[in-house]
Amino acid sequence: MNVEIERNFGEQPIAGIMEGHGLKAQDLVSISTEQLTYKMVYRACKGRRLTLNVKSKIRDALNKSIGEEYSMEELFTY
């Protein structure tokens, strides 16, 4: 069972949204009430495969920081 799992999906829409609002990874980490790390945010922007739980934490922190409601489909292409 040597099934190759796609891990890199290229830059994600969340990177453009964060840039448009002038946000950095530090902003999401500091506003999050959940355990969120810089590495998780960087991986999300770069397009590394993340678990649903991590994507939810990032979405919640982003929505809280800008006061808008983005869905998973708007932030991630996978």
Each PLM stretch: what is its role?
Residues 26-35, 60-65:
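DNA-recognition alpha helix
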Residues 2-3, 69-78:
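Short amphipathic recognition helices of helix-turn-helix/homeodomain-type DNA-binding modules
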Residues 1-29:
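A short, Lys/Arg-rich alpha-helix, primarily the initiator
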Residues 53-70:
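DNA major-groove recognition helix of helix-turn-helix/homeodomain DNA-binding modules
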Residues 34-50:
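Recognition helix of helix-turn-helix/homeodomain-like DNA-binding domains
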Residues 27, 38-40, 74:
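Residues in the helix-turn-helix
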Residues 30, 43, 77:
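Phosphate-coordinating loops and pocket residues in cytosolic domains that bind phosphorylated ligands
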